[in-house]
Amino acid sequence: MEGQPRGSRGPLEKPLPAATHPTLSSLGAVFILLKSALGAGLLNFPWAFYKAGGMLPTFLVALVSLVFLISGLVILGYAASVSGQTTYQGVVRELCGPAMGKLCEICFLTNLLMISVAFLRVIGDQLEKLCDSLLPDAPQPWYAAQNFTLPLISMLVIFPLSALREIALQKYTSILGTLAACYLALVITVQYYLWPQGLIRQPGPLLSPSPWTSVFSVFPTICFGFQCHEAAVSIYCSMWNQSLSHWTLVSVLSLLACCLVYTLTGVYGFLTFGPEVSADILMSYPGNDTAIIVARVLFAVSIVTVYPIVLFLGRSVMQDFWKKSYWATRGPPVLADPSGPWVRLPLTFLWVVVTLTMALFLPDLSEIISIIGGVSSFFIFIFPGLCLICAVDTEPMGPRVKCCLEAWGILSVLVGTFIFGQSTAVAMVELL
């Protein structure tokens, strides 16, 4: 199917989902997928190397996870083409039934809401630390407090970017955000070799043998870091070329590039600080280092560009709820279209206000990263596995191929269930 334009399909493919004027290029899809994955998890990756007991266990877990991460994206594209749906929750509802669709909507909305709050906290923390670096001996001015900077950025920058109707329009800001995340990885790599003044050299990161169960502690960070699967269906349905082989190539290129950025950050951050590495890698560096100050600014920019993608996905669930509401069925005509400005803009504003309020008044969210990573396993492993099991029943194929696909779907569900249970249990114990 390689090279087939949108609308042409192989003998085993169902009609492609009907998206409104899909114009997203392959390069644009790569950047949106890449930016969706290069989020706040980048700061935690060096710390994950330490928690897992060193580089070798982390590499092994990451390589195994990468196979499931790529297959999950491919499965979601295949499931979208089979079901004819254009949203993640729509695909699950169509293939797995209404009950599973409801569960997907609840998990989807909860997970994206938590991610949005975490992103806003990261933005606020980076801006606050930036002010401390620029004014080390002065009291914090009122305009540098998160209570002022976060609402200002949310209303002037985040809300306009999030109000866009289609996810394809995020490709421009995604390029900027991807470059900002790459700069962070580059700075951490270069700092290891240059050892600037003020950076204390730590002894080699040779750790004492850790229990084999410690390797599982890296799963939440991987799931939180590589979570671009929630956006996969929307991105796939926005592409002009929707052949499955082409989508596979886009998925592989995106995750390999993402893996490179995460690996450079994790390896060199861990080699630099060893067991003393901070959960926020930027906190381990001197606050007056110019390169680190620039990295803080650019990383905040990176998170600002990924927030609208998360909001777009959460808004799609709210728009599905709106379609079934009284106002959509019996209200004025302008309220019948959930993607129209009279519905889209208020829903966007509501999402920004709710997440902003939670970010300002809830305690530190760093401890619930494991919970977010655990819930993300639903969208990376469990739901794609269930969709594959259900989708093969609708396609004419040989018994051996069908058996292999069903076995892979079952394995994906089992792995996702284990990761969810393990990471959530550990997170709850740490919170208590």
Curated annotation (Swiss-Prot):
Expressed in neurons located in the gray matter. Highly expressed in thalamus, hypothalamus, amygdala and pons. Expressed in the CA3 area of hippocampus and in the Purkinje layer of the cerebellum (at protein level). Expressed in the eye. It comes from Mus musculus. Electrogenic sodium-dependent amino acid transporter with a preference for L-glutamine, L-alanine, L-histidine, L-aspartate and L-arginine. May facilitate glutamine uptake in both excitatory and inhibitory neurons. The transport mechanism and stoichiometry remain to be elucidated. It is found in: Membrane; Cytoplasm, Cell cortex; Cell projection, Axon. The gene is Slc38a8. It catalyses: L-glutamine(out) = L-glutamine(in); L-alanine(in) = L-alanine(out); L-histidine(out) = L-histidine(in); L-aspartate(out) = L-aspartate(in). The chain crosses the membrane at residues 29-49, 59-79, 103-123, 144-164, 175-195, 215-237, 253-273, 292-312, 345-365, 368-388, 409-429. Its main location: membrane. It is a multi-pass membrane protein. GO terms for cellular component: axon; cell cortex; membrane. Keywords: Amino-acid transport, Cell projection, Cytoplasm, Membrane, Transmembrane, Transmembrane helix, Transport. Pfam families: Aa_trans (PF01490). This is Solute carrier family 38 member 8. Disulfide bonds: none annotated. Belongs to the amino acid/polyamine transporter 2 family. GO terms for biological process: amino acid transport; aspartate metabolic process; neuron projection development; optic nerve development; response to virus; retina development in camera-type eye; retinal pigment epithelium development; viral genome replication. InterPro entries: AA_transpt_TM (IPR013057).
